[in-house]
C-alpha cells in the first residue's frame, strides 16, 4: 500500500486531550496540508430505535462505529478523491443528512478513542500517537464537554461513564496504548513531544515523492 498520503492516528481515552494534540499538529504542520477526520463522526445511525433506547446504547464499544465507511474514506483520500464526512447529532444519536466535504491532502490525521483497536485501521497509519491522561481528569473534562457541547444532563453523563465509558476504556482503549509510536503523558500538554512528532511528519513529507 502506498505511504502517500501520510496517515497519522491520535488515540486515547475520552476527553484525554486528543483534539488538543491534533490542533497543535494542525497549527504546526499547516491545516492546508492536513485532512482532519474525527472518528466520532462515524457512529452508527440509531434513528430506528426509540430515543430512550438510543440513550442507553454503548457508544464506547468498537461495534458502535462504522469503520467500513471510515476505511473507505481513507482509501478514497489516498487515491486522490474527495470524501463527504458524515455528521452525527450527539443529542439525538442519529446521523444527519448534512455532510462535510474534505479534499485530499499530503497528511490525513484521524483522531478517536478506538482507532488503534481495529487492525484494518491501524495498518493504514504510519504514525500512531496515544494521549495518556489520568482517569479523574478525563471524567471532569468529559462532564463539562457533554453538558456544554452536547446538551447532556449531569446525571446522564455520570451514569454513562460508570456503565460503559470506564469499563470499555479498560477493555478496549487502554490496551491499544502498546501500538503507539509516541505516548503523550499528562493530557498531551507536552511541547517537546509535539516538536518530535512535527519533525517526523516534515521529514516524511520531504521523503515522499
From Swiss-Prot:
Q: Where found in the cell?
A: Cytoplasm
Broad class of the protein's primary localization? cytoplasm
- GO cellular component terms, semicolon-separated: cytoplasm
Q: A GO term (biological process) for this protein?
A: UMP salvage
Record's Pfam families?
PRK
Q: Which domain of life is it from?
A: Bacteria
Report residues binding ATP: 12-19
EC no. given is: 2.7.1.48
Task: Name the enzyme's class.
Answer: transferase
According to its UniProt record, which reaction does this protein catalyse? Answer: uridine + ATP = UMP + ADP + H(+); cytidine + ATP = CMP + ADP + H(+)
Q: What SUPFAM superfamilies would the database entry show?
A: P-loop containing nucleoside triphosphate hydrolases
For molecular function, the Gene Ontology terms on record are: ATP binding; cytidine kinase activity; uridine kinase activity
Task: Recite the UniProt keywords alphabetically.
Answer: ATP-binding, Cytoplasm, Kinase, Nucleotide-binding, Transferase
> In what pathway does it function?
Pyrimidine metabolism; CTP biosynthesis via salvage pathway; CTP from cytidine: step 1/3; Pyrimidine metabolism; UMP biosynthesis via salvage pathway; UMP from uridine: step 1/1
Sequence similarity: Belongs to the uridine kinase family.
Which HAMAP family does the entry mention?
Uridine_kinase
| Name used for this protein in its record | Uridine kinase
Amino acid at each position: 500500500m502506498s505511504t502517500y498520503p501520510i496517515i497519522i492516528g491520535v488515540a486515547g481515552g475520552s476527553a484525554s486531550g486528543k483534539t488538543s494534540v491534533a490542533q497543535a499538529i494542525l497549527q504546526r504542520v499547516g491545516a492546508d496540508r492536513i485532512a482532519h477526520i474525527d472518528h466520532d463522526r462515524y457512529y452508527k445511525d440509531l434513528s430506528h430505535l426509540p430515543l430512550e433506547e438510543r440513550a442507553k446504547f454503548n457508544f464506547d464499544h468498537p461495534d458502535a462505529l462504522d469503520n467500513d465507511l471510515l476505511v473507505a474514506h481513507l482509501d478514497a483520500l489516498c487515491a486522490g478523491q474527495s470524501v463527504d464526512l458524515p455528521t452525527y447529532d450527539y443529542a439525538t444519536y442519529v446521523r444527519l443528512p448534512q455532510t462535510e466535504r474534505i479534499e485530499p491532502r499530503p497528511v490525513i490525521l484521524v483522531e478517536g478513542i478506538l482507532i488503534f483497536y481495529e487492525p484494518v485501521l491501524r495498518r493504514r497509519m504510519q504514525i500512531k500517537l496515544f494521549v495518556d491522561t489520568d482517569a479523574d481528569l478525563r471524567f471532569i473534562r468529559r462532564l463539562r464537554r457533554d453538558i456544554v457541547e452536547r446538551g447532556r444532563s449531569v446525571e446522564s453523563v455520570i451514569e454513562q461513564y460508570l456503565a460503559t465509558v470506564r469499563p470499555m476504556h479498560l477493555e478496549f482503549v487502554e490496551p491499544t496504548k502498546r501500538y503507539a509510536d509516541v505516548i503523550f503523558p499528562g493530557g498531551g500538554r507536552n511541547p517537546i513531544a509535539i516538536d518530535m512528532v512535527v519533525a517526523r511528519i516534515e521529514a516524511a513529507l520531504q521523503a515522499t515523492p
